[in-house]
Amino acid sequence: MSACPAPRSPFRWLHAFTLCLLLAVLAGCVSVPKPMAGAGEDVFSRVGRFAITVTESDGKQQAVQGGFAWRDDGGSYLLDLTNPLGSTEARVEGRPGMAVLTRANGERLAAEHPDALAEDALGSPVPVTGLRDWLRGRLMAGAAPDGLERDAQGRPTAFEQDGWNARLSRYDAQGPQLLVLQRQEPGRRILVRLVITQP
């Protein structure tokens, strides 16, 4: 994987990472997602919390946490991200060929693909497409996993894909309720923890 230039400051990178890492997670509102038009069997939704810690090579840490809710009908998706006080920080809307991130201040970023949107905002690749699979307890298509471990039901519990070490646990009928993702980049280590609080 090619290295990308780092953003100007760890905090800026962390803030952008917070907004973009969860592009794969989908929501219609800050609380429980509302039904999408034409919703059917492919509808997938989750509500939860996230915590992201970036540790620099000199030991300095930047951390951010908040809430998320998402709704995915298999084609289009909606996402809201909130800060710990419950205020909306960003909304993401996506469909085939388009992903748009709108921040609380009205700033908009758009790209044809959510991975490209994340990389534009971060200056570093993020497996947005992979997260959509991992949150459902599936492996990302097109990228062979390393160190794959499964539970007694055959569900993935540990693996490495696209530069991320992932641990999935506390499965319910929709997927893991706890995801711990780690990535080592030049000069920094990224730790992401997602906890599902509502199906």
UniProtKB/Swiss-Prot annotation:
SUPFAM superfamilies: Prokaryotic lipoproteins and lipoprotein localization factors. It is found in: Cell outer membrane. GO terms for cellular component: cell outer membrane. It is a lipid-anchor. Keywords: Cell outer membrane, Chaperone, Lipoprotein, Membrane, Palmitate, Protein transport, Signal, Transport. A lipid is attached at residue 29 (N-palmitoyl cysteine). Pfam families: LolB. Residues 1-28 form the signal peptide. A lipid is attached at residue 29 (S-diacylglycerol cysteine). GO terms for biological process: lipoprotein localization to outer membrane; protein transport. The keyword Signal applies. Plays a critical role in the incorporation of lipoproteins in the outer membrane after they are released by the LolA protein. Monomer. Belongs to the LolB family. This is Outer-membrane lipoprotein LolB. It comes from Bordetella bronchiseptica (strain ATCC BAA-588 / NCTC 13252 / RB50).
